[in-house]
């Protein structure tokens, strides 16, 4: 009780400080800014971001429509199916590597509990590297004593990355010869399942015969400081709305590695297994290279290529235990952004080549926006800085006031997602916009550079010395050229 009171008081103080800063900024800007007849009127500063705000607004409206109207209708239809929607068999596959014993115990305890409580014939498939994990799982298994319809299968894998772990697990499931009504849940080694998540996810495959995979809502517990914790929670709130928006078209853009559920005939398809295990890109400048990370994007692309739909179940929740890769928030967030945005951009260009007939026009528009957002996100800040240097500091003050007000509104809208909001969200939103855009630009010209945050595995391509030199220097040259053109164009406009 006391902890809740202290947290509430701290958050109230944070909101008061943020609102006070907005008032100070409002007092600092010229009075003409608030004059609707003035050329400096505050809303003009938002014109440069009209594309970004319109895309965000469309996602929000679509997300709320799905969450509060469409999904409840679908859920009623699923409940009407009753036991007819039950799968013939459920496989719960967990991949674990270099995760602490406490987290591993929490994860497997939740998985075994779900296998018992679901009532379905279930096989828990443990894709593991270390013997200590096997000993821990066997101990939990004996303690929880599941019924005969629940079985345990261990798959020992080399510690060469998650892709290999998934492929070994998929092949192990193939040896069980699952039928067309069987489903497979792929669960990360740091994901704790909420009560009832299996029963909430598996019936959807009967309602939607063409859905090949679906993913779930995420909440998190962060093993880090306050800002790092809020940063992750904000990300999951934004993810929830975007997932709901894309689920309206049955085109959810990623099969989240933390927990996604597939038809068994998908994960046992040799093409799908190859796509996940040996995904690669043929780049015009960087050559051919394998994907080290981003198995969630590879599985999504494979589903699209094979002709399946994707879906999102917002009331099926999982809880992830986040371990930041660095103690410093700046370093940790940059490292995570580098991996996430790299995975995103590596899939983007080839996803667009699937075309509107396969993806739909809205999905094509979203994929296009992912490519241009790295520049549009920086537009307002760069214009404000140039205008303040060329004309008056008032332009920068107006811009900062605009950012404060709009991020406050965005934060309040995020509360409608069902995720908790905090006073740090407006600042973190802007941090994500600017730093995220810079990271995207950097990684866009270096798509071949990949590494894990949990293990020291890096992509080794065995290139000749000249090819390595050419890739490095051409990446620098293209980054500098693109940034120079961007600034030069804005200088001619301002």
UniProtKB/Swiss-Prot annotation:
Q: How does it sit in the membrane?
A: Multi-pass membrane protein
**What's the short name of a Pfam family annotated to this entry?**
Glyco_tranf_2_3
User: What gene, per UniProt, encodes this protein?
Assistant: alg8
Q: Which GO terms describe its biological process?
A: alginic acid biosynthetic process; extracellular matrix assembly; hyaluronan biosynthetic process; polysaccharide biosynthetic process
| Biological or metabolic pathway of the protein | Glycan biosynthesis; alginate biosynthesis
**Record bears the keyword Membrane:** yes
Q: Where are the transmembrane segments?
A: 12-34, 49-71, 381-403, 423-445
GO cellular component terms attached to this protein's record? plasma membrane
Q: What class of enzyme is it?
A: transferase
Chief location of this protein within or outside the cell: membrane
What this protein catalyses is: [(1->4)-beta-D-mannuronosyl](n) + GDP-alpha-D-mannuronate = [(1->4)-beta-D-mannuronosyl](n+1) + GDP + H(+)
- What family does the Swiss-Prot or TrEMBL record give for this protein? Belongs to the glycosyltransferase 2 family.
The name under which this protein is listed is Mannuronan synthase
Q: Where is the protein found, in the record's own terms?
A: Cell membrane
What is known about what this protein does? Processive enzyme that polymerizes GDP-mannuronic acid.
The answer, when asked if Transferase is one of the entry's keywords, is yes
Under SUPFAM superfamilies, the record lists: Nucleotide-diphospho-sugar transferases
The record ties this protein, via PANTHER family, to:
HYALURONAN SYNTHASE (PTHR22913), MANNURONAN SYNTHASE (PTHR22913:SF12)
What GO molecular-function term can you cite, just one? Answer: hyaluronan synthase activity
């Amino acid at each position: 009780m006391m902890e809740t009171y202290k947290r509430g008081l701290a958050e109230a103080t944070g909101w008061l400080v943020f609102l006070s800063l907005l008032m100070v900024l409002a007092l600092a800007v010229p009075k003409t800014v608030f004059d609707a007849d003035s050329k400096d009127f505050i809303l003009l500063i938002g014109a440069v971001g009209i594309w970004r705000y319109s895309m965000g607004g469309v996602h929000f409206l679509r997300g709320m429509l799905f969450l509060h109207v469409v999904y409840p209708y679908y859920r009623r239809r699923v409940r009407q199916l009753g036991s007819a929607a039950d799968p013939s068999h459920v496989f719960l596959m967990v991949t674990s590597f270099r995760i602490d014993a406490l987290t591993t115990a929490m994860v497997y305890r939740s998985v075994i509990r779900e296998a018992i409580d679901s009532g379905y014939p279930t096989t828990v498939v443990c894709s593991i590297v270390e013997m200590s994990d096997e000993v821990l799982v066997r101990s939990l298994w004996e303690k929880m004593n599941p019924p005969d319809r629940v079985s345990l299968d261990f798959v020992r894998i080399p510690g060469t990355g998650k892709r290999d772990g998934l492929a070994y697990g998929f092949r192990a499931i193939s040896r069980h010869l699952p039928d067309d009504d069987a489903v497979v849940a792929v669960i990360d080694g740091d994901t704790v399942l909420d009560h009832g998540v299996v029963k909430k996810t598996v019936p959807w495959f009967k309602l939607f015969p063409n859905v090949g995979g679906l993913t779930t809502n995420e909440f998190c517990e962060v093993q880090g400081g306050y800002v790092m914790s809020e940063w992750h929670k904000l990300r999951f709130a934004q993810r929830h709305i975007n997932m709901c928006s894309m689920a309206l078209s049955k085109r959810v853009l990623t099969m989240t590695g933390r927990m996604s559920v597939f038809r068994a005939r998908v994960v046992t398809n040799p093409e799908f297994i190859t796509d996940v295990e040996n995904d690669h890109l043929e780049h015009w400048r960087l050559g051919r290279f394998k994907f080290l990370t981003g198995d969630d994007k590879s599985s999504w692309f494979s589903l699209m290529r094979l002709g399946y739909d994707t879906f999102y179940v917002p009331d099926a929740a999982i809880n992830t235990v986040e371990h930041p890769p660095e103690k410093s928030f700046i370093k940790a967030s940059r490292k995570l952004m580098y991996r996430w945005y790299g995975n995103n951009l590596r899939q983007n260009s080839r996803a667009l080549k699937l075309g509107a007939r396969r993806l739909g026009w809205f999905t094509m528009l979203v994929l296009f926006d992912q490519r241009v957002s790295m520049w549009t996100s920086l537009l307002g800040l760069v214009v404000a800085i140039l205008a303040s240097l060329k004309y008056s500091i008032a332009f920068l003050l107006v811009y900062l006031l605009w950012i404060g007000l709009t991020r406050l509104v965005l934060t309040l809208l995020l509360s409608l997602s069902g995720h908790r909001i905090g006073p740090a969200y407006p600042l973190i939103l802007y941090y994500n916009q600017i730093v995220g855009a810079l990271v995207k630009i950097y990684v866009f010209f270096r798509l071949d550079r990949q590494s894990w945050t949990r293990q020291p595995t890096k992509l080794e391509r065995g290139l000749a010395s000249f090819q390595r030199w050419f890739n490095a220097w051409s990446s620098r040259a293209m980054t500098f050229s693109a940034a120079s053109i961007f600034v030069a164009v804005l200088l001619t406009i301002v």
